[in-house]
Amino acid sequence: MAEIISFMALPFDFVDGAIAAGEPVKCQSPAAAVERAQTLWKVFGHAGSVAFSRTSDLEIGKFGEKHVLRLFGHVTDEYR
């Protein structure tokens, strides 16, 4: 199986004084991931969100590095 690129939007919330990631949302394109991340932050009131892409080869269980497309609000240092 060849490598595939996944586009994700990931919300963040303040939990016990720290920032915690929520459930990622899979998107169809980079633009859709950015739009969804912005919506999670602005409309749904999360502390922040990030749109990112990542390559993966599920057959061998290999996941590539995350590539941040856009940040909104407060996110963990992992995405900065």
Where are these regions (language model features)?
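Short aromatic-glycine-(Arg/Gly/Cys) micro-motifs in beta-strand/loop hairpins
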Residues: 1-21
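A short, charged, amphipathic alpha-helix used as a generic interaction element across diverse proteins
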Residues: 27-48
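Intrinsically disordered, low-complexity boundary segments flanking structured domains
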Residues: 11-12, 37-39, 58
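Generic detection of intrinsically disordered/low-complexity segments and helix-coil linkers/edges
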Residues: 1, 6-8, 35, 46, ...
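Beta-strand-rich interaction surfaces with strong enrichment in secreted/lumenal proteins
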Residues: 23-25
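Short, mixed-charge low-complexity intrinsically disordered segments
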Residues: 41-80
